[in-house]
């Protein structure tokens, strides 16, 4: 397998996000006092490995353009608050139309207060996204495999997320108690060509769909103006629509702290003990261990910010059995120039995916380097140039999974990739 790192001036991987940042909102007050705000982001860039191929000879290199609009409506009635939001991401590749995509994100938030001590919030999100060819379900697929399985465009994903939360405590009080019920659902679409080409792989894709019920019980303590503690219990029950052997239950006990330790140092840390069970798979092993998400920030000078971050979590694989332990470590430095209007950022992250309870003991190592230059031309206009280099190496040259009624058809994934892209972004608050 040919793996070579190319140093190409790049402007950053696009990470789907439901909002645009770094701009001061412009309010347009309409009927009934509703506050309308809108933004648009315009991207232009070049990506050297659109489908994350391991072999340079298979890599597709293409220029692209993106339009990312966002609009939201904010309303209030006494202490009650409401939010409606839409954002989109419309990307087109020159010379590679097969990987074009259109994403949509919808959100509703409602917050109601009943007296001084009681609150109720409802959050509904619907994310109509996509899965890049060569990532996720099609990770490690070569161009011939895309053709063999009828994958002529990115798979579409629909992730619905809802939360109903009750809070007890004064709005500006020291502490509060929350109880929340959650429901999430994942569906995968744009599979008609796959169904007509290979029914076994089509059924494999359907096996990745799931729904999940969750419960959160949480206590928050605003210990001081600078420090807040949080204690949380979480339970998730994920059920796969077809492949019940992948069903699992998760139970978390979490402790969190967010504190301004000194004038120059801040920390935001969450640590949890996780117990994960696979009740329908006799060959699986339950997991118990520690997850964490920690970020510390040090600002020795007004114009300089150092950040270190680390996290560990457990995620489900595409196949039956086992789990993936995802660990991340990173460091970043941001410097502000020209009275904070211009900034430069260096960020390096090292990620590992360790496949547990797997026969080949697979371990992937992913290194991501990012350099960004950001300029606030006006409070409502921001421009940015990013460079990012994303390389993944594995201790295995390939991995495989099996499809078909008897699970006897082997599908091989070729592991590793070298991806870089350059992107210029302009964001405008309308």
Model-derived features: positions:
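Transmembrane beta-strand segments of Gram-negative outer membrane beta-barrel proteins
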Residues: 30-48, 81-84, 227
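Transmembrane beta-strands of outer-membrane beta-barrel pores
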Residues: 42-50, 77-79, 88-94, 126-132, ...
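Surface-exposed strand-loop-strand hairpins of Gram-negative outer-membrane beta-barrel proteins
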Residues: 43-66
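Hydrophobic, lipid-facing positions within transmembrane beta-strands of outer-membrane proteins
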Residues: 65-71, 104-108, 158-164, 211-217, ...
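Residue-level signature of outer-membrane beta-barrel architecture
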Residues: 73-77, 110-114, 164-170, 217, ...
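Repeated loop/turn-to-beta-strand initiation elements of outer-membrane beta-barrel proteins
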Residues: 79-82, 116-122, 171-178, 187, ...
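Outer-membrane beta-barrel "beta-signal"
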Residues: 414-430
